[in-house]
Amino acid sequence: MSAKFFIVATPIGNLSDITLRAIDVLKTVDFIACEDTRVTRVLAEKYGFGAKLFDCHKFNEKERSEKIISLIDEGKTVALVSDAGTPGISDPGSVLIKELREKDIEITSLPGACAVTTFLSQLPRNNEEYAFIGFIPRNKKQQEEILAKYKYTNCVFYESPNRLIETLENISLDRRIAVGRELTKMFEEIKIGTVQEIIEYYNKNTLKGEIVVMVYAQEQNDVSEEELKSKINILKEEGFSPKDISKIISKLYGENKNKIYKLVIE
């Protein structure tokens, strides 16, 4: 093999979802840099990888970059894997790749399982356009800004089971979404419905595993500023506070909450 460094996609759940090429490379390289050696060791034992494993995660990636460059300079071959999917895509790897590119080290990437495409391929969609966010920020304001930015595009993101309900509560309850979990595993599940329906379902059912969410694109029926002001005035007359008005209007029309607040206090 002429290349010295390999980015290798690994299964996202089902251990059989690995390519023959990936197995061949992981059996051949001298070292495998892993997000978590314990996770990769399970794969190594199943397929007989004999390479030495060492950790390379978001907390030591800069330090490990130096080690990997040193190994390559010594003529060794190194593969980078994450716990699931492709390194550098919502996983550690981008810092290392930058360092390798700056050193003009040849990189070969091996494609494989991907949670986003596995999820999207099973969904009915009005259009093919989508924006992949990665892990959505925990901050509610940042979430609102992202959802407002992509309100006319199918917006796809990862979320943890512990935060899913809280994140969904920050989206208009009548917005159509899809939620996938445990993809490629025995208990794989995909639910499609309104935010309200999905919240009610997962309040009654166990929520485990990695989560992928798609917020369906809104129809492009923009509301004029005058109409927004009219709705705002109605709520003012009903005695709602500026904060509550901003929240209600932004969820009804998918508008940025800060934009609505500015209209409220004009």
Report each predicted region and the residues it spans.
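Glycine-rich, flexible N-terminal cofactor/catalytic loop recognition
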Residues: 1-58
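A contiguous loop/helix-start segment that scaffolds small-molecule binding in enzyme catalytic cores
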Residues: 2, 77, 154, 158-266
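Short active-site oxyanion
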Residues: 26-32, 104-107, 153-155
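Conserved helicase motor
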Residues: 56-62, 135-139
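Short phosphate-binding loop-to-helix
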Residues: 58-73, 92
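A glycine-rich beta-strand to alpha-helix segment
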Residues: 73-118, 164-168
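Class I SAM-dependent methyltransferase SAM-binding "motif I" and its flanking Rossmann-like core
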Residues: 95-150
